[in-house]
């Protein structure tokens, strides 16, 4: 353990108290292992499960869905953000599951729960991992083949890397429109990578972007878009990209914070 012993990470700093709520909730850490110099190299791993699942039901009970998606879920995701503001580092939703997604059952509670978690993860800029085992057989059947009805739900577009910071992105499963916005950094020469799953886009990959970007299909993988910031580009707004399955694509109006907020309203999960 460099610089700081692990036990030191759990010690309460002077002046802290139980009134802050840090004692009862959160990770219990007051700094990342290794101390402040390791903030940029640390990632908090956490899991998400709604505790009141009713496994024998087909559809959500209305109060259960409201509790999960309007109270419990937002509190957990927001709590993880607050924890990161306190101790620093990044975060990774390394496990969620129990919900069994299926494109042939859109009203099934498992499908709706998985879609909600992924949409919420997008809002918070989170990578995620769905938990499956050989006994569950959610993603792979007994013959080792992919379960396509699950793939249809769990496979989504996402930014693998971006030449900038402060990224925001969203995906609308109905229109199949993916939106990305970020503050570009011209000095980054390596192209960013956007993953566009073939089960959603196939050969119908249309995109529109801000003038400061160069966007092209990747030579290494037909499911990837390469994003590069143009040299000597001048922009007073955020860089943006929109991808869809038709040529009729909206723009992200990045002239001010209000326009940016309004452009994302249709894709916010309430």
Where are these regions (language model features)?
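Extracellular glycoside hydrolase catalytic/binding regions
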Residues: 1-118, 122
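C-terminal catalytic-base region of ester-bond hydrolases, centering on the histidine
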Residues: 44, 61-66, 87, 99-100, ...
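Generic short alpha-helical hydrophobic face used as a protein-protein interaction/packing hotspot
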Residues: 48, 132, 209-211
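Short, low-complexity, polar/charged sequence segments that are solvent-exposed and flexible
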Residues: 62-67, 147-150, 200-201
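Short Gly/Pro-enriched loop/turn and capping motifs at secondary-structure junctions
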Residues: 97-101, 135, 187, 200-201
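Extended, alpha-helix-rich binding/interface surfaces that flank or overlap catalytic cores
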Residues: 110-195, 204
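C-terminal beta-sandwich/jelly-roll accessory domains of carbohydrate-active enzymes
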Residues: 169-270
């Amino acid at each position: 353990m460099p610089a700081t012993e692990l036990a030191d990470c759990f010690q309460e700093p002077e002046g802290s108290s139980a009134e802050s709520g840090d004692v009862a909730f959160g990770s219990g850490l007051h700094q990342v292992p290794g101390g402040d110099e390791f903030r940029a190299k640390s990632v908090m791993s956490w899991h998400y499960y709604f505790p009141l699942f009713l496994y024998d039901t087909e559809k959500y009970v209305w109060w259960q869905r409201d509790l999960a998606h309007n109270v419990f879920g937002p509190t957990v995701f927001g709590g993880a953000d607050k924890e990161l503001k306190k101790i620093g580092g990044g975060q990774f939703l390394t496990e969620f599951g129990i919900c069994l997604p299926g494109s042939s059952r859109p009203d099934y509670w498992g499908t709706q729960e998985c879609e909600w978690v992924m949409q919420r993860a997008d809002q918070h800029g989170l990578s995620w991992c769905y938990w499956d085992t050989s006994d569950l057989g959610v993603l792979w059947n007994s013959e080792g083949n992919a379960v396509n009805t699950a793939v249809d739900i769990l496979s989504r577009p996402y930014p693998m890397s971006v030449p900038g910071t402060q990224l925001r992105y969203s995906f609308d499963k109905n229109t199949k429109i993916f939106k990305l916005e970020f503050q570009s950094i011209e000095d980054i020469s390596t192209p960013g990578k956007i993953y566009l799953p073939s089960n959603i886009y196939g050969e119908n990959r249309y995109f529109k972007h801000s003038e400061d970007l160069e966007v092209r299909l990747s030579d290494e993988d037909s499911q990837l878009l390469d994003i590069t910031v143009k040299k000597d580009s001048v922009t007073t707004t955020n860089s943006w990209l929109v991808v869809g399955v038709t040529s009729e694509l909206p723009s992200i109006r990045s002239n001010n914070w209000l326009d940016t907020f309004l452009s994302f309203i249709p894709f916010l999960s309430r």
